[in-house]
Structures are given as structure tokens and as C-alpha cells.
Amino acid sequence: MSGSSLRIVVPALLVIVGSVPVSLPAHAADGTIVVQRQVQPRVAYRPSMVPDPHPTVVDTNVSAEVNALANGAASGNTVSRELGDADFAIVTSGSGIRSMILTGSALPGFASQPANPATVQAVGNLGTTHGAGGGAGAGLAGQINGSLKQGLAPLQMLGGGQ
């Protein structure tokens, strides 16, 4: 081949070889995340000084902890199996508490008439009737309304008592 044909063939060959996709296997790193690192000041055109020898890092690779738990070696645990149906069967949704909270389709303390005077007395002033107000609900509502009126009194004074 002559020199002029080599000048044409070699770049064409490089373009062909460069355009062929090369698929190398991608490997994940160990999962270390650098949270904080001391960055040393330097002049822009000089190479950096020594990097921080002790950066604050977080290792997200938890395989050692997971394997230790699965084998029962971490802190005396005996977890060496997967969770089964029996493990999930003992979990409750809290629906049983509904019967304890709702007594006669009303929330305790908000009934119009207190069911048990001893219970009302144990609660305190909430159950005492105030005029025609009713039971514990009216007492609680009266306390809330009184607190709101007291808190809004400065604004009412600014508005001329309206």
C-alpha cells in the first residue's frame, strides 16, 4: 500500500473500531457514601495536596448484619427462619379497641348525660352540669369556649367589643 492509501485506511479503520459498542460488565461498588470530607484550599493550577485521610463515611452495605441476624449470631438473637403465617396471625389491627372506646355509639366523656356519677366525679369538673348545659360534653365545651373567649379578649377590645 502506498502512503496516501494508508492515510485514508487507518482513520477509517479507527472510526469503524471506535463505533463498535464494547459492553464490559458493570460492577457495583461497595456502597460506601462519603458524608463529609475536609477539602483543603489550593491554588487552581496546582495539584491538590493530600486528600483527607479520615473522611466521614457511611457504609450502606448491610449484608454482614443481615447475615448475622439470619444466622442468629447478632446479640444473642435466634432468628434463623422466615416469618410464617402464624407470625402474622398474632398481629392485630386495633379493631378490638373500638368496642372499648365507643360505648353506646358515643365517645366517653361526650355523652349528654353521664352514665356513672362515680366515674364523672373521678374525672373532675368535666361531668358536672352547668345550668341547662348537660353532662360531660357540655362541661368540656364550656371550658373550651371560655378559654377561647379569654384568649380572644384582647382582639375584642381592639375591635371595640364587637
UniProtKB/Swiss-Prot annotation:
Keywords, sorted A to Z: Chaperone, Periplasm, Signal
Any one of the GO CC terms: periplasmic space
Highest taxon listed in the record's lineage: Bacteria
Record bears the keyword Membrane: no
Position of the signal peptide: 1-28
Gene Ontology BP terms: amyloid fibril formation
Phenotype upon gene inactivation: Both a single fapA deletion and deletion of the entire fapA-fapF six-gene locus show no visible growth phenotype and no change in biofilm formation.
Keyword Signal: yes
Induction: Constitutively transcribed with a peak during mid-exponential phase; maximum transcripts are seen under 37 degrees Celsius and at 200-500 mM NaCl. The first gene in the probable fapA-fapF operon.
Subcellular location: Periplasm
Its biological purpose: An intrinsically disordered chaperone for fibril amyloid FapC that guards against fibrillation within the periplasm. Upon overexpression of the endogenous six-gene locus (fapA-fapF), cells form large clumps during liquid growth, make large amounts of biofilm and produce amyloid fibrils.
Self-association state and partner proteins as the record states: Monomer in solution. Interacts with FapC but not FapB in vitro.
Family classification: Belongs to the FapA family.
Protein name listed in UniProt: Functional amyloid chaperone FapA
Source species of the chain: Pseudomonas aeruginosa (strain ATCC 15692 / DSM 22644 / CIP 104116 / JCM 14847 / LMG 12228 / 1C / PRS 101 / PAO1)
Lineage, uppermost ranks: Bacteria, Pseudomonadati, Pseudomonadota, Gammaproteobacteria, Pseudomonadales
Gene expressing this chain: fapA
